[in-house]
Amino acid sequence: MEHGHATNRVDEYGNPVAGHGVGTGMGAHGGVGTGAAAGGHFQPTREEHKAGGILQRSGSSSSSSSEDDGMGGRRKKGLKDKIKEKLPGGHGDQQQTGGTYGQHGHTGMTGTGEHGATATGGTYGQQGHTGMTGTGAHGTDGTGEKKGIMDKIKEKLPGQH
């Protein structure tokens, strides 16, 4: 029965690997404006493909979901750690950015269903990054100006202006 059917293959991190087409079929992420047009939270089924972390940079392990804890095991990274790795400007413990502003666990773009509005879910250049949901109007600082979540995180980082 050995005809290329790899049943229990894993990569170097212990994640299961399918024997065919790993990482394919994910090129159309960032479905802009697709979401809960009638309000409510739209939570699509999670595709746990983890093929090098959706951005698929060759040779980059910065987008894996676990890291070595120094004791031979692995620990899951929090959403804040993943976001910090993607931001430019170093990986020091500068400030706690707050991550996704209380929307933990939501994947994909929720959107508002407006015409032509691109549902600024904060995924600027990070296609399909989990946890970056919303319309960009969460806590607009009282000015009425809509900001993306990435803009808010960048504001909190020193030296980004």
Curated annotation (Swiss-Prot):
Comp. bias intervals (Basic and acidic residues): 1-12, 143-161
Gene induction: By abscisic acid (ABA) and water stress.
Regions of compositional bias (Gly residues) in chain numbering: 20-38, 131-142
GO biological process, one term: response to abscisic acid
Highest taxon in the source lineage: Eukaryota
Residue ranges, compositional bias (Low complexity): 93-107, 115-130
Region 2 X approximate tandem repeats, residue ranges: 101-144
Gene Ontology, cellular component aspect: cytosol
Region Disordered, residue ranges: 1-161
Pfam families according to UniProt: Dehydrin
Keywords of the record: Repeat, Stress response
UniProt repeat feature Sequence, residue ranges: 101-123, 124-144
Family: Belongs to the plant dehydrin family.
Protein name: Dehydrin DHN3
